[in-house]
């Protein structure tokens, strides 16, 4: 994923959304699946996803995080230009599971919305842009934040283990955001609210609009 530019440290309400998320196929999705050469594989993948959510919904939070991270990480990674022909394209969860592959932000977004369906509060979930040691560009992970004064847990497509950020020596924090706000953070805690400068290319806002309003 390309470098996400952010700054302007201000107290700011980033995005508010009162809708609950539901993973529901619409007529466009069904037509796409029915006309796909991968129809059987797609239906099997969606069936497994549905079964997984039913099996996981009543578990405690630590088990939910671990199982969601493991389940979604089994999906094969593929860079955006290979998968959709667009550089740094952010998929909706339905696109991710129908296509069966994605880039780092697609994993993080799929985990975010899956955990919302499993009853985790959106106030506790943040997409986070990070730098990876000895790697060019930036990377995206999902954070679970129980207390903003403690190290968040990291759900990462590069690791099947859910660990506190303080134990991920390979990652350096940049910025974390969800539907409600955005934060600067360290390995040990969230520090201050920020405003993200999307430079007229707010991919997150587009994902939220497509998910909640367009059911894509």
Model-derived features: positions:
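Sec-dependent N-terminal signal peptides
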Residues: 4-14
């Amino acid at each position: 994923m390309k470098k996400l530019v952010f700054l302007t440290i201000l107290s700011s309400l980033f995005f508010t959304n009162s809708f609950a998320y539901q993973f529901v196929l619409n007529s466009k999705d069904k037509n796409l699946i029915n006309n796909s050469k991968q129809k059987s594989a797609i239906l099997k993948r969606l069936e497994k996803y549905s079964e997984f959510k039913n099996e996981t919904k009543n578990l405690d939070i630590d088990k939910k995080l671990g199982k969601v991270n493991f389940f979604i990480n089994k999906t094969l990674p593929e860079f955006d230009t290979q998968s959709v022909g667009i550089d740094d394209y952010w998929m909706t969860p339905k696109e991710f599971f129908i296509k069966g592959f994605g880039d780092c932000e697609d994993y993080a977004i799929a985990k975010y919305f899956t955990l919302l369906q499993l009853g985790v509060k959106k106030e506790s979930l943040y997409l986070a842009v990070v730098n990876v040691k000895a790697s060019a560009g930036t990377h995206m992970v999902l954070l679970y934040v129980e207390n903003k004064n403690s190290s968040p847990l990291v759900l990462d497509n590069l690791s099947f283990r859910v660990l506190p950020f303080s134990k991920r020596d390979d990652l350096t924090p940049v910025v974390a955001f969800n539907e409600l706000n955005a934060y600067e953070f360290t390995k040990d805690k969230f520090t201050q609210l920020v405003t993200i400068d999307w430079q007229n290319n707010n991919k997150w806002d587009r994902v939220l609009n497509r998910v909640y309003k367009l059911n894509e």
